[in-house]
Every structure is written in structure tokens, then in C-alpha cells.
Amino acid sequence: MSWWSGVWRSVWSALSREVREHVGTDHLGNKYYYVAEYKNWRGQTIREKRIVEAANRKEVDYEAGDIPTEWEAWIRRTRKTPPTMEEILKNEKYREEIKIKSQDFYEKDKLGKETSEELLPSPTATQVKGHASAPYFGREEPSVAPTSTGKTFQPGSWTPEDGKRQSQ
């Protein structure tokens, strides 16, 4: 840190009236601060801030899970009070239990599928044509010439000649 940046920081802290209140630290080493609403030297009201000072200072080193969920909720203002260390540890223990239970369930389900596959015969290949609600009796495709008349009339197929319109 250069000498000028130190001078600038001390001048800025004297003018800003921003007072950081240390609220807590998590088990990963991140520090959390609260800055109450205040008026700056120009008379503007600056709203409250909630700040995290990460243990690893580079943004590039950030990975999901570096900030516990409870602290993240406090920073985003979805929770009013900062979490306690006991609460964070209790929730992490609960997440681990859920992970173990889901893994057990997955293994039991996989075992159940293997035994049911042995009991059931393999499905036969079916031919699907048309809409599911319409019965298919092996009808032929429409022919070029129309067939029959009246109620059993089926039109013939049609192909356009060329893209030019005929004028009348």
C-alpha cells in the first residue's frame, strides 16, 4: 500500500462518517459488517449497508458455498438478524443428514428397480401411428384418384403444379 492511498483512506473515513460495526465471523474466516444509515458531508442520506469481507480476497477465487446460506440471507436482507454460529452448525448438520438419507433412498430405489426388472418381461416393440385416441386399422395412404362417393368418400392426394398464379 502506497503512502498516498493511506492518506486518502484516512481523509475519506474522516469525511464519510461511515462507521462499520463488526457483526460476526463465520467458520470459513469471512467477516461481516453492518453500517447504519447516516448522512454524509453533503447532507445526503445513505441507506444502511451489510458488507462481507471474504477470507480469500480475490473475486476469482470465489466458489459457491464460500459464504454460508444464513449469512447470505442476512446480506441480501431476507433476514433481519445475523445468524449465530450454533444455528449455522445445526443447519450444516441437518444438510449432511439429508444428503445421507437421499443417498440411502437412491441406493434402495436402484436395488428395487434391479429386482423389478428381473421379474417383469421385457416390453415388446409397438408401432405407433397417428393420434393416440384414433384407432388405427392399417389404413392405406390416400391414392391419387378419389375413391367411392357419399359417406365413404376419400379424397385423392394433390400436388401443386408450379409457384405461378394463373390470372383469370
From Swiss-Prot:
Disulfide bonds, paired cysteine numbers: none
Superkingdom as given in the UniProt entry: Eukaryota
Keyword vocabulary terms for this entry: Chaperone, Cilium biogenesis/degradation, Mitochondrion, Phosphoprotein, Transit peptide
Name the UniProt record assigns to this protein: NADH dehydrogenase [ubiquinone] 1 alpha subcomplex assembly factor 2
A GO cellular component entry from the record: mitochondrion
Listed transmembrane segments: none
Biased composition (Polar residues): 145-157
Cellular compartments annotated: Mitochondrion
Keyword Cell membrane recorded: no
GO molecular function terms listed in the Swiss-Prot or TrEMBL record: protein-containing complex binding
InterPro entries: ComplexI_NDUFA12 (IPR052618), NDUFA12 (IPR007763)
Protein task: Acts as a molecular chaperone for mitochondrial complex I assembly. Complex I functions in the transfer of electrons from NADH to the respiratory chain. The immediate electron acceptor for the enzyme is believed to be ubiquinone. Is involved in the initial steps of cilia formation, including removal of CP110 from the mother centrioles, docking of membrane vesicles to the mother centrioles, and establishment of the transition zone.
Record-listed Phosphoserine modification sites: 133
Family membership noted in the UniProt record: Belongs to the complex I NDUFA12 subunit family.
One Gene Ontology term from the biological process aspect of the record: negative regulation of insulin secretion involved in cellular response to glucose stimulus
